[in-house]
């Protein structure tokens, strides 16, 4: 189920994004990016619709994923 990120408090959204970024551990190439930069990137992706916030009833978890990968 998709969660409208706009309905979350900014603190909750920031905490979810930070948790996601720390969990992902993605390699950003030659230049490591700060946590703040990674959080800002994910927030921008949510704002422009490239990424969505998703609740998994099966796993009872929240995740962030590319919009094109989301299947209801």
From Swiss-Prot:
Q: Which InterPro entries match?
A: UPF0270, YehU-like_sf
Q: State the superkingdom.
A: Bacteria
Coiled-coil features, chain-numbered ranges: none
**UniProt similarity note:** Belongs to the UPF0270 family.
The protein's matches in NCBIfam families, at most eight in alphabetical order, are given as:
PRK04966.1
HAMAP family reported in the protein's UniProt record: UPF0270 (MF_00690)
Name of the molecule in the record: UPF0270 protein CKO_04772
């Amino acid at each position: 189920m998709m969660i409208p990120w706009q309905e979350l408090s900014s603190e909750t959204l920031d905490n979810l994004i930070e948790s996601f970024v720390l969990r992902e551990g993605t390699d950003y190439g030659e230049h490591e990016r700060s946590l703040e930069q990674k959080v800002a990137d994910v927030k921008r992706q949510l704002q422009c619709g490239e990424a969505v916030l998703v609740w998994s009833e099966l796993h009872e978890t929240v995740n962030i994923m590319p919009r094109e990968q989301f299947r209801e």
